[in-house]
């Protein structure tokens, strides 16, 4: 996985890096029946009536959500032209990654339409940021209430609005879940028996209230408190995911790119050894310096097939 600090130092040296190959144009029948183009295929699990890869491609790098700083976010947006977004999605499909953690912001809808017009197919697991009327036309496999919006609702005592959103999605015929960055919020939903099908949990607690940070750090003030990643956090989210019988997706398992090389192997191994066989992970790909799609697909394949 790319070390984003090192990348910022070397970006100028790699400015001429180009796209390796054009997108595939053969139209497969569905994400489940696409003919693999690589010997390495990410293992799958059943979810929402389909078979999906346990590694799901994330969308954050596509649209500059670096969770690092404005500079890296800008570099990501400049790199990820519509052509490159589609190429990465096609490459994911060649490695058996057939699910996409989609968010309907900016030009994401146009990029998805282009990918599909080129013959690409992905099961969409949508980050829900609008009403079901904006989600149903996408024909998603599933949708979940966006994690930061869930956390804000919890802090403001408005969890009934999240429950109502889930009900409206259910009434619209959607397979529905709840996302959060805090295991205690997902426990809140689980303990109250909400009518939801699955959970999406950030393994690092990025949305700690200021008062909690003061307790954790003995009153120290932080720069960018929502981008601090504590090593003690992942086991807490993984514990919740093991305990619930519902499918779960873990995200930010690489601490938004802060974990690399051997550390990435360990992070993926920790994730898959800590969650259930019906669970998966969302991981964004930024192949600006190295072939992260291949690296991550091979890593997950190796971990899951040798278990």
List the model feature ranges, each with a label:
Residues 1-14:
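N-terminal secretory signal peptides and thylakoid transit peptides that target proteins
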Residues 105-115, 151-165:
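Active-site-adjacent beta->alpha loops and helix N-cap segments on the catalytic face
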Residues 112-119, 132-139, 240-243, 271-276:
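Acidic (Asp/Glu)-rich catalytic clusters
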Residues 290-307:
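C-terminal helical cap(s) of enzyme catalytic domains, especially alpha/beta-barrels
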């Amino acid at each position: 996985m790319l070390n984003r600090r090192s990348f910022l130092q070397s970006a100028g040296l790699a400015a001429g890096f180009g796209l390796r190959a054009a997108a595939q144009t053969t139209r497969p029948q569905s994400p489940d029946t696409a003919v693999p183009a690589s010997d390495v295929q990410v293992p799958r699990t059943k979810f929402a009536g389909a078979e999906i890869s346990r590694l799901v491609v994330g969308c954050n790098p596509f649209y500059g959500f670096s969770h690092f700083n404005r500079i890296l976010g800008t570099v990501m947006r400049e790199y990820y032209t519509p052509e490159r977004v589609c190429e990465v999605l096609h490459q994911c499909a060649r490695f058996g990654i057939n699910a996409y953690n989609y968010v309907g912001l900016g030009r994401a809808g146009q990029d998805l339409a282009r990918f599909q017009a080129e013959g690409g197919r992905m099961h969409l697991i949508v980050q829900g940021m609008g009403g079901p009327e904006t989600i149903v036309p996408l024909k998603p496999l599933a949708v979940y209430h966006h994690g930061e919006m869930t956390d804000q609702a919890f802090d403001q005592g408005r969890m009934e609005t999240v429950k109502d959103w889930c009900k409206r999605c259910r009434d619209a015929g959607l397979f529905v879940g709840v996302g959060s960055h805090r295991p205690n919020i997902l426990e809140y939903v689980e303990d109250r028996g909400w009518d939801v099908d699955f959970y999406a949990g950030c393994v690092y607690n990025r949305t700690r209230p200021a008062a909690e940070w003061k307790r954790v750090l003995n009153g120290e003030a932080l720069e960018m408190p929502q981008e601090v990643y504590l090593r003690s956090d992942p086991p807490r989210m993984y514990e919740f995911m093991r305990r619930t019988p519902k499918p779960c997706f873990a995200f930010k398992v690489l601490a938004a790119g802060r974990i690399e090389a051997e550390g990435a192997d360990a992070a993926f191994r920790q994730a898959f050894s800590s969650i259930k066989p019906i669970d998966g992970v969302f991981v964004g790909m930024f192949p600006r310096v190295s072939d992260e799609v291949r690296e991550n697909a091979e890593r997950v394949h190796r971990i899951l097939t040798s278990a």
